[in-house]
Amino acid sequence: MLLRLRGPDGMLRIELDPKDTFNKLGQELMGKLPPTVDPATITVSNAPGSQGDKKLLKDIAKYKVEAIGLKHGDLIFVDYKHQGAEADGTANSDGASQPLTSTTNRLNGQPVLPTEDLPIDPLPTPAPGATIKNPWEVVRQSPLDDRLDKKDGKIPRKRDAMCRHGPKGMCDYCQPLDPFDAKFLAEKKIKYLSMHAHLRKINSATNKPELGSSFIPPLSEPYFRVKHDCPSGHPQWPEGICSKCQPSAITLQPQPFRMVDHVEFASPSIVDSFINTWRRTGGQRYGIMYGKYSEYEEVPLGIKAVVQAIYEPPQVDEVDGVSLNSWDNEKDVNQVARLCGLEPVGAIWTDLLDAGAGDGSVVCKRHADSYFLSSLEVCFAARLQAQHPKPSKWSDTGRFGSNFVTCIISGNEQGEIAISSYQVSNEAVEMVRADIMEPSADPTVMLVREEEEDDGSTSRTRYIPDVFYRRINEYGANVQENAKPSFPVEYLFVTLTHGFPDVAKPMFSDEGAFPIENREYMGESQEHSAAAKALKVHEKASSGSSKDGMKVSNFHLLCFLHQMSVLSKDEESLLCRVATQHDLADAFQLRSTTGWQTLMAILQSTGERIPKRSRQTDVLAADPAASSYPGRRGIDDSDERLAKRFASVRLNARGDGRNGRDRPSAHET
């Protein structure tokens, strides 16, 4: 009889006698499997994946094939694991730490030799796109998302002219509206739904509690990569692919919602100090914005990012862009921000060019006839958002989108310096992850990559599905176009609003001026002398004032003090609390700690020195009469010193005439 066996490495055919046992089947099977297969992990089943009844081959080795009910031509599904690697290609903790030895044998007694072959495209851990069972029980959201989940989000309305009921009644004309009501959003000129309003809209269509059906997570992230562990049993991509594991065609459309609705800068000085680099050097600048997320009342169930500080990582400023260097202390800066109750909320960079009019005006580069966000900036923002995913218990993967925002400082149509805020769509982030698109020289279009590499060879890891987008043609019809080779970038991002509070209450008061990091080429460097000057260490020692010594409410100064590694963790936490909450009791407690006293001693010995007074100033202070005529006193002192110098020269000349030229003078000795 002929049996067909389908496994992870393809289809096998084995001829057996019905009287043979499964031990004989295992011997024939091991001769055709890769040498790295672990015989103890071979399983057989009557259905693919977890649908069938899996049995270990070693447990049924004594049974005959006909006793199980197998007939000629039957299909058996086989699964196994490799030595030193799991079945999905990720490293095994036990096998990876111990090398293979000759004691590992096959079922027929032959030794299994080690191999150097590695999978072409190993899976990351955990596998991307993997779903989570009951994510609403295991996923931990931010406190802000939990608060918004508890709100109903209804938009209240007053009594309308069409109402015919009393003050305590309600009808269709005055009942509250849903947060995703299209008519209300159009009246308020709100272009995009908030994330939680979009969630309510999707959930109302996905789950019907009145029907008694089980709950289904309403959110799902797009996935445009080839799925691994395909249940069809063929070799993994790129050796094999089928309709179940390959991604579907992509139809791009503008994203109807945004994860963050508004960007608020706590103080105008935050942006002004960031732009000073361009004002002084003419080069562009890049920074990471640190702040926190809070509710935004102007949009139903809205979220805003409140920026409290901008950290400038190592970079090389140029007239037309920025080259980023390695940011070695990123974890340290994030730790300081975490102690202050902050987190990275976005990235900001400048794109400014002086108009040459001499009135401070700049050139308007970004407008409706050119572009707002270039293709290169879209890819860069997508990578940043991919590094900051947002956990969500409403998604089947436990995460959905990102709250990371992008701000660009450029010139507007009036020639003024203006800020523009954006976010890249979730589809754009996934297309960058899947390596489907790449930026072009034209900032208004994005290119769809080819499966061939630059040298003409076919990529063994990249799979490019069909990409389409819809547009209004010259006849006013809504048509679908092929995105290859390029498509407009407007399909890949959404716009955000921005602004400043009416009454600025920044977290960092910035009372002590301290240089911003990585500005050495401008003549600004973070040194001990700058820290001593910002903290007014010497003035404190001379005047005894405790208030002057506590000017630590500066994010850049906190990062510098963290790099000095003088304070302990508890003392540094207390320092950040003093800098953000401005509590006088905490300030006195900090002054009494050992670490702070050690820091003050270091800054006093290596920091800023008090300039010494000149001798003339000491004389004027000791002689009040001389201070009444400072000009004449200075003239008399200079004349007196000059007369003494000439007198010394004359005495030396006379001594040389009497005693000879070889004898040194008293002045020379």
UniProtKB/Swiss-Prot annotation:
Pfam family name, one: NPL4
InterPro entries given in the database record: MPN, Npl4, NPL4_C, NPL4_Zn-bd_put, Ubiquitin-like_domsf
Entries under Gene3D superfamilies matching the protein: Cytidine Deaminase, domain 2, Phosphatidylinositol 3-kinase Catalytic Subunit, Chain A, domain 1
SUPFAM superfamilies: Ubiquitin-like
Gene Ontology CC entries for this record: cytosol; endoplasmic reticulum; endoplasmic reticulum membrane; nuclear membrane; nuclear outer membrane-endoplasmic reticulum membrane network; nucleus; perinuclear region of cytoplasm
Topology class, membrane: Peripheral membrane protein
Start and end residues of each stretch annotated as Disordered: 87-112, 613-637
GO molecular function terms attached to this record: ubiquitin binding; ubiquitin protein ligase binding
Start-end of Polar residues biased regions: 90-108
Main location, first listed in the record: cytoplasm
Location(s) in or outside the cell: Cytoplasm, Perinuclear region; Endoplasmic reticulum membrane; Nucleus membrane
Gene Ontology biological-process annotations: ERAD pathway; mRNA transport; protein transport; ubiquitin-dependent protein catabolic process
Domain (MPN): residue spans on this chain: 263-400
Function: Involved in the import of nuclear-targeted proteins into the nucleus and the export of poly(A) RNA out of the nucleus. Has a role in the endoplasmic reticulum-associated degradation (ERAD) pathway.
Family: Belongs to the NPL4 family.
The protein's name in its UniProt record: Nuclear protein localization protein 4
Classification lineage: Eukaryota, Fungi, Dikarya, Ascomycota, Pezizomycotina
Gene label: NPL4
